[in-house]
């Protein structure tokens, strides 16, 4: 990055560095250096009085330059009549807001691969599904538990097959729930009743990652990242139109979410260029998603996951 010099490692140098006795102390110092780098930008839309209630946390800001902008639908009401018990009406009214606490984030040499956002609140779930619809996203990754009190993340989809949630013009039906080894994959159908159009959404839910901790097994996150990318690749081949960004969220949308995107970027860089530079990767993400990877433990986990992935690939190459 201009003005900041970080070492770019090839695979062998990366292993050599991570094998040193003082490496994890070095990682903590490197994380502090990255956190101290000033990033210029404004957060005016985050601070607008009419948007304050849409922010889950008052101290987790959202950049203006990379924010996701929604269209204005007006505040039309939709009459769903007497639902059959399997359709839950969260709200019958469209949201007229163009603001959502969400940011475009690049992949490695792939513009806007991700939309990183806060965990939807009950009052912003309609905006969330509007974002998914308008930006043609087909894959959602949730890295947090949900809770009835809406303190962490509202349950914006139903964890039971054949049930539906209605958010104004958007109806989300759970078609199939597939329990994988460490996460849950759900096939959803998103319908825009105003145009009578629908499409399939693939939802990946990994609730075992605590807010201030890390997964005990890096293989779980690596497997999740692999399955998410595999599904997106499949949809690129079969969809009528190119799938939009992968939507990733936790609760605030910066810690676990930023860590997920960092690992994905680093692995892509390794595959394409056989090099990796985690501080540079994190800094790039922080320029698009404010305050990402803010904990040293999250930063260290990025190193652990990349190292684990490399060891696994070497074992496959030489022992299988």
Curated annotation (Swiss-Prot):
It comes from Microplitis demolitor bracovirus (isolate Webb). Its EC number is 3.1.3.48. The active site is at 250 (phosphocysteine intermediate). Keywords: Host-virus interaction, Hydrolase, Inhibition of host innate immune response by virus, Protein phosphatase, Viral immunoevasion. It is an enzyme of class 3 (hydrolase). It catalyses: O-phospho-L-tyrosyl-[protein] + H2O = L-tyrosyl-[protein] + phosphate. Belongs to the protein-tyrosine phosphatase family. This is Tyrosine phosphatase H3. Residues 22-309 form the Tyrosine-protein phosphatase domain. One of its GO terms (molecular function) is protein tyrosine phosphatase activity. GO terms for biological process: symbiont-mediated suppression of host innate immune response. SUPFAM superfamilies: (Phosphotyrosine protein) phosphatases II. The gene is H3. It comes from the Viruses. Suppresses host immune cell adhesion and phagocytosis. SMART domains: PTPc, PTPc_motif.
